[in-house]
């Protein structure tokens, strides 16, 4: 257990510091019971020790935001916090600085690059607000995994701790501007589900209109297509084709066989119904004389 701070006989380890930050982020109400709740979440610490540690933390955050000290380099993903590199508290945390250097010696270069104290951008802070609205305080792992994917859960917890300290700070007129002053994402409710993409409904309506207009209506048939109207036409009497050259003028049944009582040359009464255009019907026996082609004689 690494020693982080010794003041008035109280020893703050890294685990105590993390528990303090989480309890501080979960209890933001301005009441005397707030410090008792925080002390209950940090084992072995009294209310007076919690208040003293809070005052030191506020001082550290104020100096970092004022630009007096450079941004800190996080010692490890599990124990990074916003005030680990404060020069004002370096005398109190001398043992922690040496322990952090020895721990970083065995780490790879990629891990060190990922843990560098890069300042939060405004877009990351807005994503943090969206995740805070959905998951609430304390679920920093879900916020890091689903919203602020560029930050670790511990970095999100540290950012939340500084954000709530900024909200509860009493010297609001004297402090510098910061992204922590952003408390909402626009004027819209972040929990409202998004509607369809603009133009999607119009394209769907146009496709439906084109599909409806593509099938022409048959006169007297409502919305039925011409193909359906032809297939549903009532059957009429047998239809006869035109006589071919060299064959008798007697017609030949085209679609339906002739009834038994119907003979060639007998005129049948016209029956109303739909017929195929161009086909002759109800034609009796007609003689047809084949004209002879004159041949040339030599």
Curated annotation (Swiss-Prot):
NCBIfam families: myb_SHAQKYF (TIGR01557)
Keyword flag Transcription: yes
A GO molecular function held by the record: DNA-binding transcription factor activity
Disruption phenotype: Increased tolerance to salt stress leading to better seedling survival and enhanced seed germination on NaCl- and KCl-containing medium, due to a reduced sensitivity to and reduced levels of abscisic acid (ABA), as well as a reduced induction of stress-related genes. Altered leaf morphology, both in shape and in size.
PANTHER family the UniProt entry points to: DUPLICATED HOMEODOMAIN-LIKE SUPERFAMILY PROTEIN-RELATED, MYB FAMILY TRANSCRIPTION FACTOR
Designated name of the protein: Transcription factor SRM1
Composition-biased stretches (Polar residues): 182-200
SUPFAM superfamilies: Homeodomain-like (SSF46689)
Function: Transcription activator that coordinates abscisic acid (ABA) biosynthesis and signaling-related genes via binding to the specific promoter motif 5'-(A/T)AACCAT-3'. Represses ABA-mediated salt (e.g. NaCl and KCl) stress tolerance. Regulates leaf shape and promotes vegetative growth.
